[in-house]
């Protein structure tokens, strides 16, 4: 599988207006490899372009996962707007998130709820990058929309949905 890079898709630079996301996660070696591969859209329904950027994360000559640290960047595929940034750092057995942010540029992203942004980012990682079964987190205020409509604008695919007030349960890691 080919690794996504900044030049794999048309993108805008990361926004100047950002909010700290406080996203916390750790990933095993196999999951880290999937994160580093990223995601290049193949169809119109693919709403995200995701790539890892960090020269210290080059593949090692010996077998095993990459080493170092860098940023996993999440862009909307149609506009190129960069919505999320996740700084990964190598840890024993995988990688962990050491910093994260969400765009607060109102011309590029209308979201303002940091708690929902953490849930959505976790969903994007689980469903799109790790290919785990995942439930799409519905935000407050879209309850009157027909089932699947809001989700389609965000991810373009059909996933089970959770109500806005439901506790968010990330997909189970394959790591033990």
Could you say what each language-model-derived stretch is?
Residues 12, 21, 34-39, 72-73, ...:
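Generic detector of leucine side chains in alpha-helical contexts
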Residues 95-176:
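Polybasic, proline/glycine-rich intrinsically disordered low-complexity segments
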Residues 1, 50, 86, 100-102, ...:
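Generic structural hydrophobic/aromatic packing signal, biased to beta-strands
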Residues 1-67, 149-176:
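Negatively charged, low-complexity tracts enriched in Asp/Glu with abundant Ser/Thr
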Residues 70-92, 98-102:
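Canonical SH2 domain fold
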Residues 59, 80-85, 106-112:
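Short, surface-exposed beta-strand/loop "edge" segments at domain boundaries and coil↔beta transitions
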Residues 4, 55, 77-79, 91-93, ...:
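Generic structural motif
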């Amino acid at each position: 599988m080919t690794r996504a890079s900044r030049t794999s898709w048309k993108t805008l630079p990361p926004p100047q207006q950002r909010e700290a996301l406080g996203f916390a996660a750790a990933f095993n070696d196999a999951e880290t490899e999937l994160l580093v591969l990223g995601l290049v859209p193949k169809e119109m329904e693919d709403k995200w372009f995701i790539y890892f950027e960090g020269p210290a994360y080059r593949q090692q000559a010996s077998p095993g996962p990459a080493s170092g640290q860098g940023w996993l960047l999440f862009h909307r595929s149609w506009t190129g707007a960069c919505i999320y940034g996740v700084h990964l750092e190598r840890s024993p057995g995988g990688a962990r998130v050491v910093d994260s942010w969400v765009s607060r540029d109102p011309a590029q992203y209308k979201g303002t709820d940091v708690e929902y942004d953490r849930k959505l980012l976790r969903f994007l990682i689980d469903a799109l990058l790790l290919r785990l079964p995942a439930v799409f987190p519905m935000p407050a205020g879209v309850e009157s929309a027909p089932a699947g409509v809001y989700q389609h604008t965000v991810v373009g695919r059909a996933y089970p949905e959770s109500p806005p007030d439901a506790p968010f349960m990330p997909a189970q890691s394959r790591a033990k």
